Amino acid sequence: ELTTYKNVAVTAQFSAVDPEGDLLTYHILNKPARGAVTMPEDGSSEFVYTPYENKTGKDSFTYVAVDAVGNSSDPATVKIKIEKPNTKVTYADMDGDPAHKAAIRLAEEGIFVGECMGGAYFFQPDAAVTRGEFVAMAMNAAGMEALEDVERTGFADDVSIPTWAKPYVSSALKAGLVQGSRSSDGQVVFQAEEPITAAEAAVLLDRALQVTDVSADTLAEEGIPTWAAQSAANLATCGVLSLDGGLSAPL
C-alpha cells in the first residue's frame, strides 16, 4: 500500500516480471477516484500518483502488464492512502519532487524543517547537506539526545563549528558516531561546514541506528568504498538507502 500526504504526489513502480525478459508496458484498467496516475512516455515501470486537491482517505486503481506480443497479465491493484500531515509544513520548491513526501515526514518527526520565507517553506533540495547538519538530523532520527551547554567539542577546528552544532558534534564524538579526520598538519578536525558524502552519511547513520550487520560481499564491485560497504549494505537491506549511482557524491 502506498501512502502520501494531502496535495503531495507519490512516485512508485508497477510490479511485473516477464519470464522471457521481454519489455513490458502497463495499462490502467480502473482509474483511481481521488487522484490521477501519470506514466512516463519512456516505457519504464515508474508511475506518479497525484491526489486531487485537498483529497484524503483511501484510493486504488488496477492495471495490467502487456508483453511485446500482446499477452496481458492478470489485473493487479495498487492501494493508496492519502493522509493529512501532522504538520503545516509543505514545501513550495518540492512540488512534483519524488522526495516531497519524505521531506514532510522529516518535518513531522522534528528531524528537519526547511526555511520559512514570506509565509512559504523551502526545502532547498539541491543544496548540499553539511557534516554538522547531518549529524544533528541523524541523532534526532535515532532519538539520541545532545549534550547541553557544550562550548568546546574537542576537535582542532572547534572555532569553525557553529554554536548550534557543537552539542550534536560533541555528543556524536562521545557516542562513537564520528571520529573526525586528519588535517594537513596532523590535527583531528571535523569540518562541520563541509558537504557530507552519501558514503560518510551512511556510516554515521548506521552507527546511530545500530543496524544489525548483513552480508556486504558484493558491494565492493558497485563502486562503494570498502570502509562504507558494511554500513551501505545494512541500510539498503532496511530500505533506508538506495545504492543506485554509488555513494561518492555529496548528499
Go through each PLM region and give its residues:
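A structural signal for beta-strand boundary/capping segments at domain termini and interdomain linkers
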Residues: 23, 58, 71-75
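C-terminal edge beta-strand
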Residues: 70-84
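Extracellular/luminal low-complexity segments enriched in Ser/Thr/Pro
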Residues: 46-56, 123-125, 190-192
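Extracellular Ig-like/FN3 beta-sandwich strand-entry sites
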Residues: 9, 56-60
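Extracellular ectodomain surface segments
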Residues: 1-31
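Feature responds to low-complexity, polar/acidic, surface-exposed segments characteristic
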Residues: 1-2, 81-100, 113-135, 139-167, ...
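Low-complexity "stalk/linker" and mucin-like segments enriched in Ser/Thr/Pro/Ala/Gly
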Residues: 27-45, 112-115
